[in-house]
Amino acid sequence: MSEFRTFVLCGLGNPGLRYAQTRHNLGFMLIDYVRYTFSFPEFLPKFSGLLSSGRVSSFLLYLFKPVAFMNNSGRPLVQLVNFYKVELENVIVFHDDIDLDFAKVKIKRGGGSGGHNGLKSLDFNLGRDYWRFRFGVGRGVGDPAEHVLSRFTALELERLNKLFGFIGTNLPLLLSDIATRKEKFLNEYKCCSQ
């Protein structure tokens, strides 16, 4: 019997319809996409969040959306990580980033919060040694807080769907890269996005 490597994929966002489809909820949107794409079961309430799990390739995945507001995302995630005894090197957090141009992505392990309140909460509760998958939403014009709480335009949603499609198709490659410290996923993404 083969052994599955376990990963937690956590999307950051705020609960409620008021925040649905906003830039700050991009992490929730991606987790929803992965659940749907890989036919994982419906989310169930657990650890002050919504949890689903399933297998993709040789990986067991826990998909998680903390339903505490963004500023308190760390507590629910640390409960899940401790309960399932998942190493931080196997935790990937998907979140918006105003310092990246729209639809640009960066992946790194560790680092600072960059002023992102969800990451501040994770760093405080969990430590910093998890993977961060940063999605660019740009700065917009005016107040950054208003920008991240604004909804995506139809054109932006179309571009996000293409990006999510790429991530869904290449999720096993992303997980394998993280497991083996290679960068095939990022190289594939760079080729695809040019």
Curated annotation (Swiss-Prot):
Keywords noted in UniProt: Cytoplasm, Hydrolase, RNA-binding, tRNA-binding
Compartments, as annotated in UniProt: Cytoplasm
Which GO biological-process labels does this protein carry? Answer: protein quality control for misfolded or incompletely synthesized proteins; rescue of stalled ribosome
The record's function comment reads: Hydrolyzes ribosome-free peptidyl-tRNAs (with 1 or more amino acids incorporated), which drop off the ribosome during protein synthesis, or as a result of ribosome stalling. Catalyzes the release of premature peptidyl moieties from peptidyl-tRNA molecules trapped in stalled 50S ribosomal subunits, and thus maintains levels of free tRNAs and 50S ribosomes.
Site (Discriminates between blocked and unblocked aminoacyl-tRNA) location in chain: N14
Q: Does the keyword Transferase apply?
A: no
Q: Where is the active site?
A: H24 (proton acceptor)
Residue numbers marked as site, Stabilizes the basic form of H active site to accept a proton: D96
- Please report any disulfide bonds recorded for this protein chain, giving both cysteine positions: none
Tell me the residue numbers annotated for binding tRNA: Y19, F69, N71, N117
Q: How does it assemble?
A: Monomer.
EC assignment? 3.1.1.29
MF term (GO), any: tRNA binding
- Where is this chain primarily localised? cytoplasm
Q: Which family does the record claim for this protein? A: Belongs to the PTH family.
Which reaction is the catalytic activity of this chain?
an N-acyl-L-alpha-aminoacyl-tRNA + H2O = an N-acyl-L-amino acid + a tRNA + H(+)
Q: Which HAMAP family match?
A: Pept_tRNA_hydro_bact (MF_00083)
GO CC aspect terms = cytoplasm
Q: Can you name this protein?
A: Peptidyl-tRNA hydrolase
